[in-house]
């Protein structure tokens, strides 16, 4: 996650004018109507915290062997990418690298995104993404190996399941997030007007295993924070909220903050967006402790952007819950149909 934020309403600098549709974009298609009743049990059962932790341990090993981090443009990032690509290829995907450069403190950084996709129609493409890079101060296991592991495991188990999606799902592992959301912005910038119009949903995972965390769902209907977001974002929020409610699990809304995570470029392009988050340097309240446990007056993740963001800095129960919710939402939108009208 690029910068400090709190999911608390009193501290939110809400990006009220975030929806600025890219010049030349074709009219957006009708929002997808997700399959809330989709049978996602088999996929959710296959996506386990145990297997996700294997990915996190591999990325921890990469950081340990490369100066303690996996920052974009570094050998640690390259080895992280190779690990993700090897896993995807073994499952039958054909991952591709999308290269780009940016300047950081006077230095030109060369890096890339990794993209891998399922079959299905590209007229209503679903992008499921999270950033692969870490800060240079630490290995970035909660931020954001946790999101990467959940996305990767969803992709692998989806391939194993033989699910044939109606809508193409593109799994994206972004580079250059920590210095300025460069990877996701590059991806959106490279879309033609017609391609942008074919992007129906963006699901973002950034920090989903915070040790003192909360189950946060992005406010897709603007009812809590007044976010001005693309039509269809409310459907994403509803899928997640309904999923957790059906399991008796409490959630709280969190705002979209401009420049905070990889959803920013998609929102600005008018692409319906949503996702999950468990907290960073913000302080957990007493009310949140009542609903989620943990310790009041302490950060959701005290190791946010620090060297202690290691494999020990992970709540595996929360990781399992968020990963299962992602698997459910991915299938719900992969099997969705456009709204009439």
Predicted regions and their residues:
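Alpha-helical metal-binding/catalytic segments enriched in His/Glu/Asp
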Residues: 116, 128-181, 326
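N-terminal hydrophobic or amphipathic helices/low-complexity stretches enriched
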Residues: 29-75, 118-119
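Extracytoplasmic/secreted proteins, especially bacterial periplasmic and envelope-associated proteins
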Residues: 42, 51-54, 58, 75-90, ...
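Metal-dependent peptidase/peptidase-like ectodomains
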Residues: 46, 123, 174-280
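Structural recognition of the beta-strand scaffold that forms the well-ordered cores
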Residues: 52-60, 96-98, 113-117, 125-129, ...
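His/Asp/Glu-rich mid-to-C-terminal helical/loop segments that flank catalytic regions of hydrolases
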Residues: 283-341
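Secretory targeting and sorting signals
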Residues: 1-29
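A non-catalytic alpha/beta surface segment that caps or lines the substrate-entry region
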Residues: 61-118
């Amino acid at each position: 996650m690029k910068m400090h934020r709190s999911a608390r309403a009193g501290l939110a600098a809400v990006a009220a004018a975030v929806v600025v549709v890219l010049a030349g974009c074709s009219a957006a298609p009708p929002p997808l109507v997700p399959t809330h009743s989709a049978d996602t049990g088999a996929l959710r059962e296959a996506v386990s915290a145990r297997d996700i932790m294997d990915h996190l341990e591999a990325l921890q090993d990469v950081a340990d062997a490369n100066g303690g981090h996996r920052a974009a443009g570094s050998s640690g990032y390259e080895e992280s990418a190779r690990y993700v690509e090897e896993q995807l290829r073994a499952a039958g995907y054909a991952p591709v690298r999308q290269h780009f450069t940016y300047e950081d403190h006077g230095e030109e950084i060369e890096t890339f995104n990794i993209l891998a996709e399922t079959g299905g129609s590209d007229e209503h493409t679903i992008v499921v993404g999270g950033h692969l890079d870490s800060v240079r101060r630490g290995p970035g296991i909660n931020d954001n190996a946790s999101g990467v592991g959940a996305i990767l495991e969803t992709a692998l188990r989806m391939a194993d399941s033989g699910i044939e999606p109606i809508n193409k799902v593109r799994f994206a592992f972004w580079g250059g997030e920590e210095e300025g959301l460069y990877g996701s912005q590059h991806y959106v910038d490279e879309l033609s007007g017609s391609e942008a119009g074919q992007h129906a949903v963006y699901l973002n995972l950034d920090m989903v295993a915070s040790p003192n965390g909360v189950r946060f769902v992005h406010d897709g209907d603007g009812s809590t924070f007044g976010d001005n977001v693309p039509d269809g974002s409310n459907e994403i929020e509803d899928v997640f909220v309904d999923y957790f409610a059906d399991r008796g699990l409490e959630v709280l809304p969190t705002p979209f903050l401009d420049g905070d995570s990889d959803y920013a470029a998609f929102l600005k392009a008018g692409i319906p967006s949503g996702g999950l988050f468990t907290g960073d340097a913000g302080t957990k309240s007493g009310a949140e402790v009542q609903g989620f446990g943990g310790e009041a007056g302490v950060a959701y993740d005290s190791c946010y952007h620090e060297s202690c963001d290691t494999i020990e800095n992970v709540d595996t129960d929360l990781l399992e819950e968020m990963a299962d919710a992602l698997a459910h939402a991915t299938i719900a939108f992969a099997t969705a149909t456009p709204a009439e009208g």
